[in-house]
From Swiss-Prot:
Record's protein name: snRNA-activating protein complex subunit 3
UniProt entry tagged with the keyword DNA-binding: yes
Record-linked InterPro entries: snRNA-activating_su3
Region (Disordered): 1-22
Subcellular location(s) per record: Nucleus
One Gene Ontology CC term in the entry: snRNA-activating protein complex
Subunit structure, interactors included: Part of the SNAPc complex composed of 5 subunits: SNAPC1, SNAPC2, SNAPC3, SNAPC4 and SNAPC5. SNAPC3 interacts with SNAPC1.
């Protein structure tokens, strides 16, 4: 197939009704397609149209707030009786207990905080078991841990998930359309990160079906893009002209037999060409791969499997596994501002590498063949690096090689 073709990729798993397990036949490559872990391949746009066709006209696509009459607690007596009966059936309790639950746990029992009341302070004389457990846990944490990573991560994740919930755009033109698809995309650590190569996403994003693949590509944050090339021991004050992302702009996504290459800039290269040529040599059994331009395709144009590992490659050899774990219609409680998507909702918290000397500040420099360092390589913060390796006039002391260091915890 000609490189950079615009044809919409086919979904062999759908059109051909291919068995997801036996599809590889006698091929000599690992069997990844496990039906209990991922779905069959399907076309995202067609799936969305089928979904919208089922719901259209029923009011289920509306992004407006539900009317007061549709809220819990605003129904009539007959509706309340039916609700009590359903609760009694689900909880295997009596109708009287269900009615008591409705009375005790109803929306009318929710109250605002009084002036000067701090929701973070747990009352001393609480009778609630859950609050008691939480209080003992927090007291133990304060007694035993000075800097609590778990607590910081817990608060951070909550803030990431909640900061955009229900947010509406100031400009009505940026409002997400009713029936828009939202995909949950998990980006795992790059393969070259040996320390953090567990099967754990370090970024989870929500993307819209109508967004181009390049919008996801531009929103992925990776420390490889921030690397600074060159050796700076003789010129530590020289500001670098470029970072890696400015110099090496090539990248691709791989989805279902198609490499989507970023060709927005003249200097972009087709990183997939080497892989395709390797695959086609000696008839390795992978079949024909296709190539396309990333900027010409939206997520609605893709064929994907939920739960299946795909690939994002940039900087030549920095490879991230990408897993799409969910696809759904937008809800009125979602962030409705299109300009905020792709929306980062979760990212992994990393320990930063500290300076070898002060052990307080994050490392900014890494040295090799350093006569002043006890190990090779050795990491220094900016202050300790200059105090140890240069005199008061800024002249270099001794022999060493110095490179700017970008810590993976930069995105914390």
């Amino acid at each position: 197939m000609a490189e950079g073709s615009r044809g919409v990729p086919t979904c062999s798993g759908v059109a051909g009704r291919q068995d997801p397990v036996s599809g590889s036949g006698g091929c000599n490559f690992p069997e990844y397609e496990l039906p209990e872990l991922n779905t069959r391949a399907f076309h995202v746009g067609a799936f969305g149209e089928l979904w919208r066709g089922r719901l259209r006209g029923a009011g289920d696509l509306s992004l407006r707030e539900p009317p007061a009459s549709a809220l819990p607690g605003s129904r009539g007596i007959a509706d309340s009786d039916r609700e009590d009966a359903a609760v009694a059936r689900d909880l295997d309790c009596s109708l009287e207990a269900a009615a008591e639950l409705r009375a005790v746990c109803g929306l009318d029992k929710l109250k605002c905080l009084e002036d000067g009341e701090d929701p973070e302070v747990i009352p001393e004389n609480t009778d609630l078991v859950t609050l008691g457990v939480r209080k003992r846990f927090l007291e133990h944490r304060e007694e035993t841990i000075t800097i609590d990573r778990a607590c910081r991560q817990e608060t951070f994740v909550y803030e990431m998930e909640s900061h955009a919930i229900g947010k509406k755009p100031e400009n009505s033109a940026d409002m997400i359309e009713e029936g828009e698809l939202i995909l949950s995309v998990n980006i795992l650590y790059p393969v070259i990160f040996h320390k953090h190569k567990e099967h754990k996403p370090y970024q989870t994003m929500l993307v819209l079906g109508s967004q181009k693949l390049t919008e996801l590509r531009d929103s992925i944050r990776c420390v490889s893009d921030l690397q600074i090339g060159g050796e700076f021991s003789n010129t530590p004050d020289q500001a670098p002209e470029h970072i890696s992302k400015d110099l090496y702009k090539s990248a691709f996504f791989y989805f279902e037999g198609t490499f989507y290459n970023d060709k927005r800039y003249p200097e972009c290269r087709d990183l997939s060409r080497t892989i395709i040529e390797w695959s086609e040599s000696h008839d390795r059994g992978y079949g024909k791969f296709q190539t396309a331009r990333m900027e010409d395709f939206t997520f609605n144009d893709l064929c994907i499997k939920l739960g299946f590992p795909y690939l994002y490659c940039h900087q030549g050899d920095c490879e991230h596994v990408i897993v799409i774990t969910d696809i759904r219609l937008v809800h009125h409680d979602d962030c409705l501002d299109r300009t905020l998507y792709p929306l980062l909702i979760k990212k992994h918290w990393l320990w930063t590498r500290k300076c070898f000397v002060c052990k307080m500040y994050t490392a900014r420099w890494v040295t090799n063949n350093d006569s002043f360092a006890p190990e090779d390589p050795c990491f220094f913060c900016d202050v300790c690096f200059r105090m140890l390796h240069y005199d008061s006039e800024g002249n270099k002391l001794g022999e060493f090689l110095a490179y700017p260091y970008v810590d993976p915890g930069t995105f914390n």
